Amino acid sequence: MPQSVLKATSEDLKKMKSAYAHHLTDTLPPGALFQAKVPGCTITAYRSGKVLFQGQKAEAEASQFSHLKATDPKSSKTPAVTKYSPPSGIASMSVIGSDEVGTGDYFGPITVCAAYVDASHLALMKELGVKDSKGLKDPQIINIAKDLIKTIPFSLLVLRNEKYNAMQEKGMSQGKMKALLHNQVITSALEKLDGKQPEAILIDQFAEPGIYFKHLAGKKIIRERTYFSTKAEGIHLSVAAASIIARYAFLIEMDKLSEAAGFEIPKGAGPHVDKAAAKLIKLHGEEALRQFTKLHFANTQKAKKWL
């Protein structure tokens, strides 16, 4: 049975329990804090902080909480160093970094960016304010991104909701979509370097390398000097720059959706999003969800309970 495991803080667990308030079960497994069942997935949260998603839609359901750290359910040991682990000294190298935004948001697209930062531009990146985007507010993201897109080579793709939903309904997992998008922006960014080769390619890890490359079977891929790491924004500024540009693009798309909806479209996937989706249905009909949301998220059914 497909499954995903996340590690959550006590505060995260409270928010998750609230998000699944309408789907909680009456009986609990030993050690469980709560259990919820939604179509295609059973979610079990343990007092240890482990949250287990099981079922055909486990990956999709877990992706709503992409800010949480994925973990191997069989081991809590430090991950082994592999050939795909970033080399020591990568922080001072010339690198193409890639990252994505929007995978855990019910509304809005997925935006993926690959950005090249030459070693000679690392100091400039710091001057521009480039750092882990999680520590930046939206106005800062916008200002920094406007400088970045005029300064460094990058490639950006936006997977809007209608196409996302069509791909998902044909059986493609979000993980495969992300792999295809990352590969495409990396390839495109390389082409913009006019033959110059980066010292490394660093991908903000969302899947094990073997799974990532399996998703890309039959595609043109670059394996040489390609590395994966979680929290890669803190490892090289190219990933931080890519994340900032991707988030900037996401904000632009969300503004467009808000204008089309006639009210502000919220980020995230919590209860406030359910209410906004219900409002969208009332104003524009249920079919409007296809252009605004990731339909397979549990929020779709939760929104209907507000009607």
UniProtKB/Swiss-Prot annotation:
InterPro entries: RNase_HII/HIII, RNase_HII/HIII_dom, RNase_HIII, RNase_HIII_N, RNaseH-like_sf, RNaseH_sf, TBP_dom_sf. Gene3D superfamilies: Ribonuclease H-like superfamily/Ribonuclease H, TATA-Binding Protein. A divalent metal cation binds at D99, E100, D204. Residues 93-307 form the RNase H type-2 domain. Its EC number is 3.1.26.4. Belongs to the RNase HII family. RnhC subfamily. NCBIfam families: rnhC. Endonuclease that specifically degrades the RNA of RNA-DNA hybrids. This is Ribonuclease HIII.
